[in-house]
């Protein structure tokens, strides 16, 4: 899946079936995000990811993850080069190893992530 949107972003919702697990492990989730090789910045509950090798044109971030809700993680994708896909894949695999998740687009359709 190749997404290269100049002024738009794709939004995906990462939802944990067990919302109690999600709420109880938010700090652990945040630490996992901060340990990704593409992590660059945290602003409150907003986490910026960037693949510096592949996306020199994007000034600040390629993906933002928002953890301000108790029901889901909002993933806003502006650009996702291979290095970023690997980083997100690692994070999603870790989540799936700890709880059951579903990933949907903004229309509620299942995502292939």
Question: What is the predicted role of each segment?
Answer:
Residues 2-113:
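Acidic (Asp/Glu-rich) sequence patches and key acidic residues
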């Amino acid at each position: 899946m190749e997404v290269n949107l100049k002024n738009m972003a794709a939004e995906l919702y990462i939802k944990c079936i067990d919302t109690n697990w999600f709420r109880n492990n938010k700090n652990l989730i945040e630490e996992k995000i901060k340990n990704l090789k593409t992590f660059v910045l945290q602003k409150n509950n907003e986490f910026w990811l960037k693949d510096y090798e592949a996306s020199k044109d994007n000034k600040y971030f390629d993906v933002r993850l928002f953890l301000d809700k108790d029901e889901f993680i909002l993933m806003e994708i502006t650009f996702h080069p291979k290095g970023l896909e690997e980083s997100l894949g690692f994070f999603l695999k870790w989540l799936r190893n700890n709880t059951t998740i579903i990933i949907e687009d903004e229309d509620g359709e299942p995502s292939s992530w």
